[in-house]
Amino acid sequence: MAHTQRQQGGSRGQWSRCLLLLLLLPLAAQPGRAAIQIPSSYYISDLKIPPAITTQPESVTVFSVEDLVMRCEASGNPSPTFHWTKDGEEFDPSSDPEMKVTEEAGSSVFYTLSNTMDTLKQYQGKYICYASNELGTAVSNAAVLMIDAPPVQQKEKKVTEKAEAGHSIALSCNPPQSSMQPIIHWMDNRLRHIRLSDRVMVGKDGNLYFANLLTEDSRNDYTCNIQYLATRTILAKEPITLTVNPSNLVPRNRRPQMMRPTGSHSTYHALRGQTLELECIVQGLPTPKVSWLRKDGEMSESRISKDMFDRRLQFTNISESDGGEYQCTAENVQGRTFHTYTVTVEASPYWTNAPVSQLYAPGETVKLDCQADGIPSPTITWTVNGVPLSATSLEPRRSLTESGSLILKDVIFGDTAIYQCQASNKHGTILANTNVYVIELPPQILTENGNTYTFVEGQKALLECETFGSPKPKVTWESSSISLLLADPRVNLLTNGGLEIANVSHDDEGIYTCLVQGSNISVNAEVEVLNRTVILSPPQALRLQPGKTAIFTCLYVTDPKLSSPLLQWRKNDQKIFESHSDKKYTFDGPGLIISNVEPGDEGVYTCQIITKLDMVEASSTLTLCDRPDPPVHLQVTNAKHRVVTLNWTPGDDNNSPILEYVVEFEDQDMKENGWEELKRVAADKKHVNLPLWPYMSYRFRVIAINDQGKSDPSKLSDLYKTPADAPDSNPEDVRSESTDPDTLVITWEEMDKRNFNGPDFKYLVMWRRVVGSGPDWHEEYTIAPPFIVTDVQNFSAFEIKVQAVNKKGLGPEPDPIIGYSGEDVPLEAPLNLGVLLENSTTIRVTWSAVDKETVRGHLLGYKIYLTWGHHRNSRAQEPENIVMVQTGANEEKKSITNLRPYCHYDLAISAFNSKGEGPLSEKTSFMTPEGVPGPPMSMQMTSPSESEITLHWTPPSKPNGILLGYSLQYRKMQSDDNPLQVVDIASPEITHLTLKGLDRHSHYQFLLMARTAAGKGLSIEILGATTLEGLPPANISLSAEERSVNLSWEARKRHRTVGFQIHYFSKNGTKNGGKWKKTEMVNSSLQFFQLQGLTPGSHYRLLFTYKNNTFWETEIQTKGTSVTEVQPSFATQGWFIGVVSAVVLLLLVLLILCFIKRSKGGKYSVKDKEDGPMDSEARPMKDETFGEYRSLESDLEEKRTASQPSLGEDSKLCSEDNLDFNGSSAVTTELNMDESLASQFSRHSEGPEPFHGVPDNSPLNPAANPPATNGAPSFLN
């Protein structure tokens, strides 16, 4: 079977498929290159496309005649033609009779027809494919064809090896020479692999190496199998016999030695990107361990690995940085050996900036970059359509740069060609085809017509106008809202044809037109400007204690057209999501709630308002702060008698600056006083000088304060005691508090114990008379105030002093003060008492001052007593009343106000001191003049008819004189312009008045005032209107139940209550009657009625009548299932009729017994029964035929009478409710129209509704006695 081997050659220079589709993609133009990219939206038909190699011919090694195939494929429009070169010469396979050529659209394939390998050898060489059309020629990579014979097994002699245990040995494989790299397998005769280890391994040369031999290594079937993948063959060598003889002596350990490679140094050359293996196979006993290191740097962990029990160092995709020195070290207990590899890495050429195919417009300058790298550096050469471009053949418009780039100036259509850039060094060659396609294309606007652009105020507006053509079209813009558009400094015409408007506003709204100059091509666009999003109230910075709840609020407003704005919260630029498990973060409208804040919650919180057009944000901070930690390390220093220095170290302020420190002390001898504040210290101080009291035992503590509160107290300082000293001060507020005559009481404020300054503290009290006693002081000691001196006469002046004393001495000398002995009551009353009447409620009182000698104390003032009895001509005697008015000590006249007009007063005056009052002066009497009266006590009204109102009132409680009559004022309330009507009532005895001729459609305001000789008094006001004739109810609604119908309606405001009836009959056949029934009279003021006793599932007709006229009718269906007529059955049998008759007879007897029992044992008073509980609203109606109506007048005639109601259809046997003829029943409410429906009381009303209010005890109140059947149900009561 023939075997072939195909190899990919020149992979770095392989030119990828150069389809025009790549040209149609928008590529980033490189510097100096004015290329054209045809957009996908540009319409063009039948565009010619330069050829491009799509399938490169491949290098191949041929081992049989069937393997020779060369293939080349290319694209282009029109389809390209192909030709070949072999070793630089033209080669036409179609002219060779040993070749067969197959050419189809876009491909060229040739293969050999030879039958022998010798014939094929003439075709060895380097082949290049050329694909051409009218736009140029593309060149393929070079493909190398090699002819090689497949490897064959050589005849060999059988090999036998002998060695002693512990020695090393290598079994040779010697694979035959071939262009293919073999794979070596050492196996036994059963094709089982020889077990490899760090002692036994296969070298890169294929040999099997033993670092040291064991007797069990002896065998006669060590076979080397050589595998060639390309030809799919395996060659098996002759088996080798290995005999390991045991040593007569104990095997001696041997230090490591290199088996492969030999010597201490080797050199390797590798190409960039290839795989390299370094190998160290060693011998020794015991088996050495092998390690690797790089002597001149670090080994790459990603590209370098170890294999074959660390005997091989493998480089994958080797790079230039891997070049250097590598050392393998073999080591056992006997020593170590080394081998050093020097690795040199070179590179075949590779692209760093490959040329790119482009389209160009005539007249443009084209720069074709072609940059490659390699070791050694490659040489750059250019060809055009496969023809070399030398320096001598360059036109003036063509030039080469030092970097290898080709520049074409002012390109024309004739410059359209395919340029080949080739980079070569000793390791290989790479080639790239690049198209220079000079083309002219008609202009087109690619942006759609009628686009609408929406922006917000202040944004930069970008209007698109994408055009394409060759040469490049020139565009301009016009606007309906901005004249001379491009002259506006905010407007910028972009190089891509777009329009940029900076800082847009509502004035920029309108239609904008993009035009291609020199043509009639244009598109329109509309610009809409919306209000920008604004944050009205940004979140505020928060400073909170741990555990509190933080609330950030972000209020904003957006344009109504910007729907569904997104409020996004961030913490330190990271999005915040609402917590559902621990409720840490909660979004509440515009608010962010952070519960139970902790140190991890500190940071910058940002609210972002995001719409589809803009985004605004505002940030704030959350700082956790707490009470400060207590100060530490308290020390008392610099003790100087009564001054010490207290030092401390501040604690942590917990993010809230210290405001101040509070120094507190505790006296160890007076712990009952607790801790007291001694001094406050500024926050920047860490020590303070403290003034102390003598004779005290101090302990100090310090508390820090910030805006979060006070810290815990610090630890206590050491105890410090101050020595005793004489008092520094005397008691304060020394005074006399003498109350009893002939006694001097000296008192003062007791001194604080800390001011005692020493032991044995007491007070020295000193006193002497101010006049007549000489300079001598009386002295006495005491331990507490007061100090009492007797026998000193009444109200005498003394000088008094109190001095502090202790065991160490006296306090400072005190200043004397004046004190007095006890007072007594004044002896005389004021004289010359006078009264001046100023008006009906005010008088002026005058008097002469009393003699100071008679006061016998400090005069504090005068007391004026006023006594009044009753008004003149008052209707009842009033009890006497006394009023006292107090004046100052220096006053001799006083105005007294708020007296009662038209009243008799007695007046007297006395002087008083701290001991009491002196005698009263002689009384003087006076009478106050008349005043205007107060308002009448009450006023109410009734309305006898639609044009009359009667007012009733009571006289004023304070007439303040003789009533002369009343004045009534009234007017319509519809407008302030209505004239005020005045009625004068001459007699004070009149207490009611009827006004006639009033407008039934108007509301009135009534004002009533009483009159005396002093004038009219205050008024009482009432609002009201007349009462209209009664009308039947309106807006009736109903709801059906199974056995009843609930009816409700609206009572007519301002109208008198009326009675109406409800007539009903069942439409379900004769079983339910088919006969009209009616309720008794229903009161329209109830607004609710329940029609009971109906049959479930039945259809009823209802008529509502008033004054024998039907004012509303309807039909209803009760809920539930109707009862169907029972078909004749056993119930018609004679025996069943007899049983029923017996039961009926028994029930009749039982009913008679019940009546007998009630007549004997249930006696009651006829009078009590007549006056007993009765539905005050329910009165039975006389028997009337259908359509008749009972008048209200007849109802009034039967008021206060009772009648027996008819028994209901569902009466229960022996039920007291049914036997008691005066119990509640289904009767209609009777109205007492004499009750004052229009009666109004003197209180504010907003309209005519109060005229129809019903008192609780009124017969019109449904809560008084609710009907039991066919009336309002009990739940309304």
Curated annotation (Swiss-Prot):
Write out the transmembrane intervals: 1136-1156
Q: Which GO terms describe its biological process?
A: axon guidance; brain development; positive regulation of axon extension
**Ranges of Basic and acidic residues compositional bias?**
1165-1201
Q: Which SUPFAM superfamilies match?
A: Fibronectin type III, Immunoglobulin
The record's annotation in SMART domains points to:
FN3, IG, IGc2
Pull the Cytoplasmic topological domain ranges from the record: 1157-1277
**Which pairs are disulfide-linked?**
72-129, 173-224, 280-328, 370-421, 465-514, 554-607
A cellular-component GO term for this protein: plasma membrane
Q: Where is this region: Disordered?
A: 714-740, 1163-1216, 1232-1277
Please list the residue ranges annotated as the Fibronectin type-III domain.
Answer: 630-725, 730-824, 829-931, 935-1030, 1032-1129
Q: Which residues are glycosylated?
A: 317, 503, 520, 531, 794, 839, 1035, 1046, 1068, 1083, 1108
Q: Where is the composition biased (Low complexity)?
A: 1255-1277
Coiled-coil ranges from the UniProt annotation: none
Family the entry assigns: Belongs to the immunoglobulin superfamily. L1/neurofascin/NgCAM family.
Spell out the protein name for this chain.
Neural cell adhesion molecule L1
